[in-house]
Amino acid sequence: MSYDQIEVPDDGEKITVDEETGELSVPDNPIIPIIHGDGIGTDVGPAAQKVLDAAAEATGRSVSWMRVYAGSSARDKYDENLPEDTVSAIRNHRVAIKGPLTTPVGAGFRSLNVALRKKLDLYANVRPTYHLDGVPSPVKNPSAMDMVTFRENTEDVYAGIEWEAGTDEVQKVKEFVEEEMGADGVIHDGPVGIGIKPITEFGTKRLVREAIEYALENDRPSVTLVHKGNIMKFTEGAFRDWGYELAEEEFGDVTITEDELWEEYDGERPEDKVVVKDRIADNMLQQLLTRTADYDVIATMNLNGDYMSDAAGAQIGGLGIAPGANFGEGLCLAEPVHGSAPKYAGEDKVNPTAMILSGRLMFEYMGWKDAGKLIRDAVEKTISDGDVTYDLERQIEGGNKLATSEYADKVVENIKELA
């Protein structure tokens, strides 16, 4: 397939998906689209590429990078923020990585990141949260945190179905709710903004399916459904019920509930079973601190997932090192959690760890777990040796402050040493 402004490498092969099984077929020299991103993306993007190339080479593979464009780079080439070229290239090549994007005022949508996820139907936002030795943390035992959050990406109050106070539309909704749905007196008089919170069986089950499959493939002992169903019974309560239903329908032979764990197995989990349990969202935020090691894979809705993953990230050193990815049906778009920080753009000083570890998550999605392990080990060795960027150096006694590019070079050096 040809594109308007995108050059497809001659020396790589496409990742494909088996239509019957849904499994990826990944060559040893895949073409992977990359969006460097806005602001500090121009620094962390190339730094991550360098590290990912080294890990691929060390495990007998190579990556053929294909530059695609969104944000400021797309405006330069296409005079628009998110060209169809980019969406098509990612969809056709299945696996991609992007840096942070800034959504300009008047862009036509609230968020470039959200728009890209919606166009590709990337329904699961996946956030691994684990501590790297040497990274300062505000908690006493940060290494207890080793959790992966699956956050539903397309529904909930983030669906964007809302109406501004003072508009004709919001008045119609208010009247309908009060007069037709029997909620008279619930909404206070005066200006009001109203939003709708859709939670569907379809959206819930495909997210929980992804979370359980991840747990099974990665030897994770439990999946926890996080919800506020004690209050929002027909939305978040339905999420809980549909989650358990999916586990029983599709994974009944390899999952057990928490009740079954205690009633049938006296609290001892069989090695071939994943425990599916649920927690109320506010209690779960406490348990992240008080019972950290009890949780492995989290499956939750959009808003809860936003809170949960950021709170968990704080326990292991902050969002500057937090990786992420978005999964769809045979699609993966990896991205760091942090923003574009335009005031540091081009200064070669920011921490590229989140982008590097997002690439690690992408490699694992592709089945390159050996390369992924090498990246984590090399990053951890680099940081524990005190070779860090300015944000960590000021928190580490005796740290050696490195530029973005120098830090990437040091990680590459450690990859070669560890391989």
Swiss-Prot record:
Pfam families: Iso_dh (PF00180). Mg(2+) binds at D306. D-threo-isocitrate binds at S111, N113, R117, R127, R151. It catalyses: D-threo-isocitrate + NADP(+) = 2-oxoglutarate + CO2 + NADPH. Coiled coil: none annotated. Binds 1 Mg(2+) or Mn(2+) ion per subunit. The record marks Y158, K228 as: Critical for catalysis. GO terms for biological process: glyoxylate cycle; tricarboxylic acid cycle. It is an enzyme of class 1 (oxidoreductase). Its cofactor is Mg(2+); Mn(2+). InterPro entries: IsoCit/isopropylmalate_DH_CS, Isocitrate_DH_NADP_dimer_prok, IsoPropMal-DH-like_dom. It comes from the Archaea. Keywords: Glyoxylate bypass, Magnesium, Manganese, Metal-binding, NADP, Oxidoreductase, Tricarboxylic acid cycle. Homodimer. Catalyzes the oxidative decarboxylation of isocitrate to 2-oxoglutarate and carbon dioxide with the concomitant reduction of NADP(+). Belongs to the isocitrate and isopropylmalate dehydrogenases family. This is Isocitrate dehydrogenase [NADP].
